[in-house]
Amino acid sequence: MKDNILKRSFHHSKFENIKELVKLKEKQDVKISLAFPSLNEEKTIGKEIIIMKSELMEKYPLLDEIAVIDSGSEDETVSIAKEYGAKVFYSSDILPEYGFYKGKGENLWKSLYALDGDIIVWVDSDIENIHPKFVYGLVGALLNYPEIGYVKAFYDRPIVGKSAMQPTGGGRVTELVARPLFSLFYPELSTIIQPLSGEYAGRREILEKLPFFVGYGVEIAHLIDIAEKFGSEIIAQVDLELRIHDNQPLHSLSKMAFELTKVVLKRLEKYGKLDLNTELTDKHIMIQKKENEKVLVPTEILSVERPPMITIPEYKEKFSKEEKV
């Protein structure tokens, strides 16, 4: 195994001195942006914004901007985000000439254009136990270690039931799909504890050179692309202890597993590790029970890939202008 990312694992408490992080940020003369990709998260988005804004902008000026990148929420997500002082962007309004896909990866890709930071932090908008550590833990690793370019969060993920909480068992797709595939083809990446976690941060000069799958495949593709283009040595991980959120039902996890497997197979072929000799289907076939019989339920799951943002002329023009100012 070429690398062991466990060696670059930190506990969030190592970076809890936010005053020191602000000093490092000012010394390095960098801007830091936080983005929440969202779709119908009215129950949690307000609390997330309040906590991050009050602690990491008003009390300590660690963050330069907080934004919500929305896929077209039909609830009160957008109005709540605006009320509590976040910048709000509809993903469909960012670089509209390139079209719009509904998906988390699309929001992340578009956020690179919308946000100004040299360091970008992405945090999912459905976290029930939100805490400033979800940001300063990730940012702290980047500010303290210039050789690190991309930081993933890890944590315990309990399964929340109607009447009780199982302390472990979340992250099922990681253990059943991602880790076995990494063990086979990228063993160094199998040492990432939560490779599919939705909380991570990176340096713009890394992120802008990565393609983005528009759906759930974005995280796993990032890790493979980073390992191939930059080396896994720039990846670190931070222990945030616990993340509580609504767990996905099994049929949703099945769709996610299909998409992740397809993305990994595409990457294996791209990097010459596998020759598929076949066209991968977009149709995921599930079997469900209706009344007293089993029926096939085919679902189309596209694996659309956005190019590296650095290849987009509008992006290059915007950020070359900012560099000259």
From Swiss-Prot:
Query: What keywords does the record list, in alphabetical order?
Result: Cobalt, Glycosyltransferase, Magnesium, Manganese, Metal-binding, Nickel, Transferase, Zinc
Q: What is this protein called?
A: Glucosyl-3-phosphoglycerate synthase
The positions annotated for binding Mn(2+) are 126, 245
Would the keyword Glycosyltransferase be found if you checked this record's keyword annotation? yes
Pfam families found in the cross-reference section: Glycos_transf_2
Using the record for this protein, list the coiled-coil segments as residue ranges, or answer none.
Answer: none
Q: Which InterPro entries match?
A: Glyco_trans_2-like, Glycosyltransferase_2, Nucleotide-diphossugar_trans
| Record entry for activity regulation | Inhibited by ADP and EDTA.
> What is the source species?
Petrotoga mobilis (strain DSM 10674 / SJ95)
User: Which Gene3D superfamilies is this protein grouped with?
Assistant: Spore Coat Polysaccharide Biosynthesis Protein SpsA, Chain A
Q: Which domain of life is it from?
A: Bacteria
GO molecular function terms here? glycosyltransferase activity; metal ion binding
Cofactor, how bound (note): Requires divalent cations for activity.
Instruction: Describe the pH profile of activity.
Output: Optimum pH is 7.0 (at 60 degrees Celsius).
Q: Which family does it belong to?
A: Belongs to the glycosyltransferase 2 family.
